[in-house]
C-alpha cells in the first residue's frame, strides 16, 4: 500500500473544538495543505525519529482515507474510497506559530521527515459504518485524543469534492481528514497506539534526535 501512495492531502481545522483550542477561526470552506511523500512513515511498532532542536512536536490524530480511482463528478465516498487508516499529522508547533506570524506557508512545520505517521490500512466499511466507531490515540497507555467523523465540520463527501476540484484526486492519493481536540506535545520514548473502534491497528515509539 505505501509504495502506491502518491499525494498526501491534509484538512486543517475540521473539528470545531480543535480550531478553538488553538485560537483559530472556524473555516467556512475546507482548509487544505499537503505533505511530501518523504514525510510518510508506517506505524509498525518501531521507533520513529523526530527533530529535537526545533521546539515542540505535537501529535494530531486523524482518520485517513485512501483513494481507489480517479475522481469523476458525481462519485460518492463509498465508490472512491477503498481503505482507511489512523494517522498522525505531526506538527512543529513553535515553527508553525512563527510561520503564521510571518504569513508564510506551513511546509517547514508540517512536512518534515516522519511527520505523516499512518497505521495499517484496513478496508473502508462505508460512511455510515464509519460513523459508528471512534478513532483514538493512546500515549503511554493513556487515551489523549478521541474523534468521530460525525463531528467533522466538512464531511468526507465535501472534502473529496473540494480536493478534486482544486487539486485533482486520483488512485493512490490519501487524505488526512482532520484532528479533534486534545492535541499535545510528544516526548522522547513516548509509546503511541493508534486505535480504531478500540482496537490497535498501529503503534510506534518516539525518539527525539
What is the role of each PLM region?
Residues 1-166, 170, 174, 182-209:
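Catalytic-core "active-site belt" of small-molecule-metabolizing enzymes
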Amino acid at each position: 500500500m505505501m509504495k502506491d501512495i502518491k499525494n498526501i492531502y491534509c484538512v486543517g481545522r475540521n473539528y470545531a473544538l480543535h480550531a478553538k483550542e488553538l485560537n483559530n477561526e472556524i473555516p467556512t470552506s475546507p482548509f487544505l495543505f499537503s505533505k511530501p511523500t518523504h514525510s510518510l512513515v508506517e506505524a509498525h511498532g518501531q521507533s520513529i525519529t523526530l527533530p529535537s532542536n526545533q521546539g515542540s512536536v505535537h501529535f494530531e490524530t486523524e482518520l485517513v482515507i485512501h483513494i481507489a480511482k480517479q475522481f469523476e463528478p458525481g462519485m460518492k465516498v463509498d465508490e472512491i474510497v477503498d481503505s482507511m487508516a489512523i494517522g498522525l499529522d505531526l506538527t512543529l508547533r513553535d515553527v508553525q506559530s512563527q510561520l503564521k506570524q510571518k504569513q508564510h506557508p506551513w511546509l517547514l512545520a508540517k512536512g518534515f521527515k516522519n511527520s505523516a505517521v499512518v497505521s495499517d490500512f484496513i478496508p473502508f466499511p462505508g460512511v455510515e459504518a464509519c460513523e459508528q466507531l471512534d478513532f483514538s490515540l493512546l500515549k503511554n497507555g493513556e487515551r489523549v485524543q478521541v474523534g468521530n467523523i460525525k463531528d467533522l465540520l466538512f464531511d468526507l463527501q465535501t472534502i473529496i469534492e473540494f480536493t478534486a476540484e482544486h487539486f485533482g484526486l486520483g488512485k493512490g492519493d490519501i487524505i488526512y481528514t482532520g484532528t479533534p481536540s486534545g492535541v499535545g506535545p510528544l516526548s522522547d520514548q513516548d509509546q503511541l497506539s493508534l486505535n480504531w473502534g478500540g482496537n490497535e491497528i498501529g503503534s510506534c515509539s518516539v525518539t527525539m534526535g
